[in-house]
Amino acid sequence: MKPTFNPNNRKRKKVHGFRARMATKNGRNILAARRRKGRKALTV
């Protein structure tokens, strides 16, 4: 079996980065929830 986690910083940013979150309504909801919770880091 191939490993399921293949680290790739570009893919990581594209999928989970701040601008990726801001691009959609649901992504903005995620950021708002993390701000509400008081997370130190909002995104990767």
Curated annotation (Swiss-Prot):
Gene3D superfamilies documented for this protein: 1.10.287.3980
Any single GO CC term annotated in Swiss-Prot or TrEMBL for this entry: ribonucleoprotein complex
Keyword check for Ion transport: no
Gene Ontology biological process: translation
Pfam families to which the protein is assigned, alphabetical: Ribosomal_L34
The keyword Transmembrane helix belongs to this UniProt entry's keyword annotation: no
A molecular function GO annotation: structural constituent of ribosome
Record family assignment: Belongs to the bacterial ribosomal protein bL34 family.
Listed name of the protein: Large ribosomal subunit protein bL34
Native organism: Exiguobacterium sp. (strain ATCC BAA-1283 / AT1b)
Lineage: Bacteria, Bacillati, Bacillota, Bacilli, Bacillales
Gene: rpmH
